From Swiss-Prot:
Coiled coil spans: none
Full protein name: Tryptophan synthase alpha chain
E.C. number(s) listed in UniProt: 4.2.1.20
PANTHER family the record matches: TRYPTOPHAN SYNTHASE ALPHA CHAIN, CHLOROPLASTIC, TRYPTOPHAN SYNTHASE, ALPHA CHAIN
Main EC class the enzyme belongs to: lyase
Organism name: Bradyrhizobium sp. (strain ORS 278)
Gene encoding the protein: trpA
Subunit text: Tetramer of two alpha and two beta chains.
Molecular-function GO term, any one: tryptophan synthase activity
Pathway the protein takes part in: Amino-acid biosynthesis; L-tryptophan biosynthesis; L-tryptophan from chorismate: step 5/5
Catalyses which reaction(s): (1S,2R)-1-C-(indol-3-yl)glycerol 3-phosphate + L-serine = D-glyceraldehyde 3-phosphate + L-tryptophan + H2O
PROSITE patterns in the cross-refs: TRP_SYNTHASE_ALPHA (PS00167)
Family: Belongs to the TrpA family.
Amino acid sequence: MTSRMDARFAQLKSEGRSAFVTFVMGGDPDPETSLAIVKALPQAGADIIEIGMPFTDPMADGPSIQAAGLRALKAGMTLRKTLQLVRSFREGDAATPIVLMGYYNPIYIYGVDKFLDDAKSAGVDGLIIVDLPPEEDDELCIPALKAGLNFIRLATPTTDDKRLPAVLANTSGFVYYVSITGITGAAAADSSAVGSAVARIKRHTALPVCVGFGIRTPETARAIAAHADGAVVGTALVDALKASLDAEGRATAKTVNAVADLAAALAQGVRGAQQAAE
């Protein structure tokens, strides 16, 4: 049976376009608003949705996503509730792939086997766990693959040809190329450097390569999508959400649309790469 992820990339390939991949923090600014945002994203043009699992010590994340995680935790978000968020989303959307992104500790505490069973039954398609290197694949990666979940690995500008085969060995779904070194949201992506980096990764794998970190505008999204199988946007969407909150950090009537409207503009940027190529 074809996975949701493979089906989505096959569909995109047949349409001659790159994926628009969105990241939002699960439970930010509260579980109910978060579900409304996730439901709005496919209508805005998101092809794949990454949902952050809030964690108290998010070392790879910049200030925006760290703050989003803290807002979610303050609103009572847990890993169990994140899985429930996916389950609720799946009631109305059976096609859009969902990837959970975060850190190993909450999964370890939840229990790996139980987490994988619950994630699969909730309708999760893949995992990105930023603090588990390939040397620790037996912890979660191999069990996840056996459970039928994609395990998506990060590659960076410092991942050289010697290291790349280890990074790619058990990766499935897609490869997430981090276009800048450092934390999320720190700088703008350089589309010219991305092209050669994606080509280098593709010499080692047939998997789609999606590029993230530093994409904030439709123009940058378009430039990146011209070189990659997907463009990932997170910090810009999280910032749009934050700007819509009231003084106490609570959702307003504008919050869902603030995220969806920016997502729609970015989706147009990604689709513009296809038009430019034709």
